[in-house]
């Protein structure tokens, strides 16, 4: 989206003067200090920084998982920093999907059951949610792994289940916290191309947290985080990796052959 167009459109996510303080023993540690940012609909954004920079704390606060000491967080016109925990739970169910570094799959559930969980929480009937879960798993290259439990799958396959779960309810906003941190290089590329392709095809906003500049290269915009502040913002559109239908088909085919 061009800069002049953005001035006419309200951001999907707007953060203003965000500050977060943790108390460790008798010491107060400022994890975030006066952070401001705007993320627009359909953008793929990366929060890039080293361990302890504050990037995951910023993501957690935008997801409503932590409360700020100061500042505001507005998502799709709603001030989530003012919401009660109950309202936040309902808001996340309606608008957000999550991809975790550690996958966070239920070990006693198979792939279909894990993927259909967000739909179950939303009250969707079993037949409908399992149909959607199957379709999403096929899209993620797991057509042959639908009945497998997490212990029966590789790390890459588990993360594909995690991605399917994050996208199955078609949330407007997806957060991915170090989504490839436990994966090898080849699987990392496959996972990133799949996740970015799905977000673009479904016109979703994707926010990725990473310490890896290669992962950041998939984003439209990169926020460099240092010591709890945004040190710089990089427009990456001219350099980003584009994923075409041919490449996406190859990724799925490779996954199916495993």
Residue ranges of model-derived segments:
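ABC family nucleotide-binding domain
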Residues: 11-225
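ABC-family P-loop ATPase nucleotide-binding domain
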Residues: 1-21, 232-258
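Intrinsically disordered, low-complexity segments enriched in Ser/Pro/Gly/Ala and basic residues
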Residues: 6, 32, 52-55, 230-231, ...
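H-loop (His-switch) and adjacent beta-strand-loop-beta switch element
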Residues: 222-235
């Amino acid at each position: 989206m061009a800069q002049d167009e953005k001035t006419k459109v309200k951001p999907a996510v707007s953060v203003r003067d965000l500050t977060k303080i943790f108390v460790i023993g008798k010491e107060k540690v400022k994890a975030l200090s006066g952070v401001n940012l705007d993320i627009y609909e359909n953008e793929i954004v990366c929060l890039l920084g080293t361990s302890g920079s504050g990037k995951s704390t910023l993501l957690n606060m935008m997801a409503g998982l932590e409360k700020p000491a100061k500042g505001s967080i507005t998502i799709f016109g709603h001030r989530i920093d003012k919401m009660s925990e109950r309202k936040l739970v309902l808001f996340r169910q309606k608008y957000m999907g999550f991809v975790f570094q550690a996958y966070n799959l239920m070990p006693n559930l198979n792939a279909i059951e894990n993927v259909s969980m967000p739909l179950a929480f939303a009250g969707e009937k079993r037949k409908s949610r399992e149909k959607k879960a199957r379709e999403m798993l096929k899209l993620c290259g797991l057509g042959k792994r639908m009945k497998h439990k997490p212990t029966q799958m590789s790390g890459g396959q588990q993360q594909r289940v995690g991605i399917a779960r994050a996208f199955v309810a078609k949330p407007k906003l997806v957060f991915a916290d170090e989504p490839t941190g436990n994966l090898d290089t080849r699987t990392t590329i496959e996972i990133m191309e799949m996740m970015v392709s799905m977000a673009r095809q479904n016109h979703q906003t994707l926010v990725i947290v990473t310490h890896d500049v290669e992962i950041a290269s998939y984003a439209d915009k990169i926020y460099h985080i240092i010591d709890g502040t945004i040190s710089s913002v990089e427009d990456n559109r001219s350099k980003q990796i584009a994923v075409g239908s041919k490449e996406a088909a190859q990724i799925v085919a490779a996954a199916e052959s495993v």
